[in-house]
Amino acid sequence: MKLSPPRPCRPPYWALHGHLQTVIGSLWPAPPLTLPFTRLEIPLVDGDRLVVRCFASAHPLPQPIIACLFHGLGGHDDRPYIRRTVRLLNQRGVHVWTINHRGCGIGRGFAKGTYHSGVAADLGEVFAYARQH
Protein backbone atom coordinates (compact mmCIF):
# COMPACT_ATOMS: atom_id res chain seq x y z
CA MET A 1 0.00 0.00 0.00
CA LYS A 2 1.48 3.33 -1.04
CA LEU A 3 0.94 6.13 1.44
CA SER A 4 1.04 9.81 0.59
CA PRO A 5 3.43 11.95 2.59
CA PRO A 6 1.69 13.64 5.51
CA ARG A 7 0.46 17.15 4.94
CA PRO A 8 1.31 19.78 7.55
CA CYS A 9 -1.42 20.39 10.08
CA ARG A 10 -2.07 24.04 10.78
CA PRO A 11 -4.64 24.76 13.47
CA PRO A 12 -6.98 27.73 13.04
CA TYR A 13 -5.78 31.00 14.58
CA TRP A 14 -8.46 30.81 17.28
CA ALA A 15 -7.25 27.40 18.52
CA LEU A 16 -3.46 27.47 18.28
CA HIS A 17 -2.84 25.76 21.62
CA GLY A 18 -3.42 22.01 22.08
CA HIS A 19 -5.24 22.45 25.40
CA LEU A 20 -7.64 24.94 23.81
CA GLN A 21 -8.27 22.49 20.95
CA THR A 22 -9.15 19.81 23.50
CA VAL A 23 -11.60 22.05 25.35
CA ILE A 24 -13.26 23.36 22.20
CA GLY A 25 -13.47 19.85 20.72
CA SER A 26 -15.26 18.51 23.77
CA LEU A 27 -17.70 21.43 24.05
CA TRP A 28 -18.56 21.82 20.36
CA PRO A 29 -21.88 20.01 19.83
CA ALA A 30 -22.28 17.17 17.36
CA PRO A 31 -25.53 15.49 16.35
CA PRO A 32 -25.96 11.83 17.27
CA LEU A 33 -24.50 9.30 14.86
CA THR A 34 -27.19 7.74 12.70
CA LEU A 35 -24.75 5.72 10.61
CA PRO A 36 -25.20 1.96 10.78
CA PHE A 37 -22.54 0.10 12.76
CA THR A 38 -21.60 -3.38 13.82
CA ARG A 39 -20.80 -4.03 17.46
CA LEU A 40 -17.64 -6.04 18.00
CA GLU A 41 -16.10 -7.43 21.19
CA ILE A 42 -12.35 -7.94 21.01
CA PRO A 43 -11.12 -10.56 23.50
CA LEU A 44 -7.95 -9.65 25.41
CA VAL A 45 -5.28 -12.05 26.66
CA ASP A 46 -6.22 -11.43 30.32
CA GLY A 47 -9.87 -12.38 29.73
CA ASP A 48 -11.28 -8.84 29.49
CA ARG A 49 -12.96 -7.54 26.32
CA LEU A 50 -12.97 -4.22 24.53
CA VAL A 51 -16.21 -3.13 22.88
CA VAL A 52 -15.85 -1.57 19.44
CA ARG A 53 -18.35 0.03 17.08
CA CYS A 54 -17.43 -0.57 13.43
CA PHE A 55 -18.69 2.00 10.93
CA ALA A 56 -18.19 0.71 7.38
CA SER A 57 -18.00 3.41 4.73
CA ALA A 58 -20.72 3.22 2.08
CA HIS A 59 -18.12 4.29 -0.51
CA PRO A 60 -14.82 2.71 0.60
CA LEU A 61 -11.47 3.65 -0.87
CA PRO A 62 -9.98 1.28 -3.49
CA GLN A 63 -7.54 0.04 -0.83
CA PRO A 64 -9.63 -0.12 2.35
CA ILE A 65 -8.42 1.75 5.40
CA ILE A 66 -9.61 1.27 8.97
CA ALA A 67 -9.14 4.23 11.31
CA CYS A 68 -9.16 3.22 14.98
CA LEU A 69 -10.40 6.01 17.27
CA PHE A 70 -9.71 5.79 21.00
CA HIS A 71 -11.51 8.28 23.24
CA GLY A 72 -9.79 10.54 25.74
CA LEU A 73 -9.33 10.13 29.47
CA GLY A 74 -12.65 9.58 31.21
CA GLY A 75 -14.62 9.57 27.97
CA HIS A 76 -16.31 7.02 25.74
CA ASP A 77 -16.80 6.44 22.03
CA ASP A 78 -19.94 8.58 21.79
CA ARG A 79 -18.27 11.90 22.63
CA PRO A 80 -18.93 14.80 20.21
CA TYR A 81 -15.36 14.91 18.86
CA ILE A 82 -15.49 11.17 18.12
CA ARG A 83 -18.85 11.52 16.34
CA ARG A 84 -17.53 14.37 14.18
CA THR A 85 -14.41 12.40 13.27
CA VAL A 86 -16.41 9.26 12.40
CA ARG A 87 -18.65 11.26 10.06
CA LEU A 88 -15.74 13.03 8.36
CA LEU A 89 -13.66 9.88 7.81
CA ASN A 90 -16.67 7.81 6.72
CA GLN A 91 -17.59 10.43 4.09
CA ARG A 92 -14.02 10.18 2.79
CA GLY A 93 -14.22 6.42 2.28
CA VAL A 94 -12.53 5.30 5.49
CA HIS A 95 -13.94 2.52 7.67
CA VAL A 96 -13.90 3.61 11.31
CA TRP A 97 -13.67 1.62 14.53
CA THR A 98 -14.47 3.49 17.74
CA ILE A 99 -12.93 1.71 20.70
CA ASN A 100 -14.03 2.04 24.30
CA HIS A 101 -11.26 1.62 26.85
CA ARG A 102 -11.79 -1.03 29.53
CA GLY A 103 -15.01 -0.39 31.40
CA CYS A 104 -16.09 2.68 29.39
CA GLY A 105 -19.15 3.50 27.31
CA ILE A 106 -20.97 0.48 25.94
CA GLY A 107 -18.10 -1.62 27.33
CA ARG A 108 -19.02 -0.79 30.91
CA GLY A 109 -19.16 -3.97 32.95
CA PHE A 110 -16.88 -6.03 30.69
CA ALA A 111 -13.64 -5.26 32.56
CA LYS A 112 -12.76 -7.22 35.68
CA GLY A 113 -10.98 -4.25 37.22
CA THR A 114 -11.67 -0.54 37.28
CA TYR A 115 -11.49 1.80 34.28
CA HIS A 116 -7.99 2.06 32.85
CA SER A 117 -7.09 3.98 29.71
CA GLY A 118 -3.36 3.47 30.14
CA VAL A 119 -3.12 -0.18 29.13
CA ALA A 120 -0.98 0.33 26.03
CA ALA A 121 -1.10 -3.37 25.17
CA ASP A 122 -4.83 -2.99 24.48
CA LEU A 123 -4.07 -0.73 21.52
CA GLY A 124 -1.76 -3.37 20.06
CA GLU A 125 -4.42 -6.04 20.46
CA VAL A 126 -6.98 -3.87 18.63
CA PHE A 127 -4.55 -3.22 15.76
CA ALA A 128 -3.67 -6.93 15.52
CA TYR A 129 -7.37 -7.85 15.49
CA ALA A 130 -8.06 -5.28 12.75
CA ARG A 131 -5.24 -6.69 10.60
CA GLN A 132 -6.56 -10.25 10.96
CA HIS A 133 -10.18 -9.39 10.20
Where do the model's predicted regions map?
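Short beta-strand element of the alpha/beta-hydrolase
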Residues: 63-72
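N-terminal cap/lid segment of alpha/beta-hydrolase-fold proteins
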Residues: 21-59
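N-terminal presequences and immediately downstream first alpha-helices
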Residues: 1-28
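Conserved alpha/beta-hydrolase
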Residues: 78, 86-110
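Short strand->helix junction
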Residues: 74-76
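Catalytic nucleophile-loop/oxyanion-hole region of alpha/beta-hydrolase
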Residues: 88, 104-133
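Phosphate/oxyanion-binding active-site loops and adjacent basic polyanion-contact surfaces
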Residues: 46-48, 78, 116-120
